[in-house]
Curated annotation (Swiss-Prot):
Record key words, sorted: Autophagy, Cell membrane, Cytoplasmic vesicle, Golgi apparatus, GTP-binding, Lipoprotein, Membrane, Methylation, Nucleotide-binding, Prenylation
Binding site for GTP: D73, T74, A75, G76, Q77
Protein name: Ras-related protein rab-39
Originating organism: Caenorhabditis elegans
Annotated signal sequence range: none
GO biological process: autophagy; positive regulation of response to oxidative stress; Rab protein signal transduction; vesicle-mediated transport
Phenotype of the disrupted gene, per the record: RNAi-mediated knockdown results in reduced survival in response to oxidative stress induced by sodium arsenite.
SUPFAM superfamilies: P-loop containing nucleoside triphosphate hydrolases
Source domain of life: Eukaryota
Subcellular location: Cell membrane; Cytoplasmic vesicle membrane; Golgi apparatus
Function: Small GTPases Rab involved in autophagy. The small GTPases Rab are key regulators of intracellular membrane trafficking, from the formation of transport vesicles to their fusion with membranes. Rabs cycle between an inactive GDP-bound form and an active GTP-bound form that is able to recruit to membranes different sets of downstream effectors directly responsible for vesicle formation, movement, tethering and fusion. Involved in positively regulating the oxidative stress response, perhaps in concert with the Ras association domain-containing protein rsf-1.
Molecular functions (GO terms): GTP binding; GTPase activity
A matching Pfam family: Ras
Length: 229
């Protein structure tokens, strides 16, 4: 775990907290993507998510400006869809994931995006940020979805787009910084704002003179009572 000791700094521990939901078919690599982002390494074995798992990490959008990302990893199986829907309401951002080596997973993205759009909450659901992410970009010999197809879909739906690899780490950090920066842009423009009772976007907290700040938080199984803080 990467840890920073911070002293003589009375600024906020983080300026904002963004809650993001990660959606897509089962086995597209959602959990592997999140584990690489939060742990800095590829998961050798990744069992299918049951219900919803929770991850978190602090990132710096610009020098001295930190945001905390809460990341909800949802199960792709149909039997868990009702559970997934309940998490949309408290999300400010949606990462729609497909596997570049599985065309069917790409064809299902439109349904996932529609479902998310219908269930998002907050004061301005239409202003919440969507981003399309293709996984397994290193597996060119098995590719079934061209980069241009993902790019076209994203442009049509007015989404950001990026391809990643949880095997090599290519573009993993960039994917999360990209969506966080777009959320921040909308906050700065007044399109998104924190409101009581909505967990999607929250203002930061202050820290004491000296604290130990963990940059990476490891996943917790929500079924085991993971907190939503």
């Amino acid at each position: 775990m990467e840890t920073n000791f911070i002293g003589d700094d009375y600024g906020p521990l983080f300026h904002y907290q963004y809650r993001l939901i990660v959606i897509g078919d089962s086995t597209v690599g959602k959990s592997s993507l999140l584990r690489y982002f939060t742990e800095g390494k590829m998961a050798e074995i990744s069992d299918p998510t049951v219900g919803v798992d929770f991850y978190a990490r602090m990132i710096e959008l610009r020098p001295g400006y930190r945001v905390k990302l809460q990341l909800w990893d949802t199960a792709g199986q149909e039997k868990f869809r009702s559970i997934t829907k309940s998490y949309y309401r408290n999300s400010v951002g949606v990462l729609a994931i497909y596997d570049t080596t599985n065309r069917e997973s790409f064809e299902h993205v439109e349904n996932w995006v529609k479902e998310a759009a219908l269930n998002l909450g907050g004061p301005s659901p239409s202003k919440c940020v969507f981003q399309l992410v293709g996984t397994k970009s290193d597996m060119d010999s098995q590719r079934q979805v061209n980069y241009e197809e993902g790019e076209y879909f994203a442009k049509y739906h007015k989404m950001k787009f990026i391809e990643t690899s949880s095997r090599t780490g290519d573009n993993v950090n960039e994917a999360f910084h990209m969506i966080a920066q777009e959320i921040q842009n909308r906050v700065d423009d007044g399109e998104l704002r924190p409101v009581d009772g909505w967990e999607g976007l929250k203002t930061g907290i202050m820290r004491s003179q000296s604290v130990c700040l963990s940059e990476r938080s490891f996943p917790q199984n929500s079924s085991a009572g993971a907190c939503g803080c």
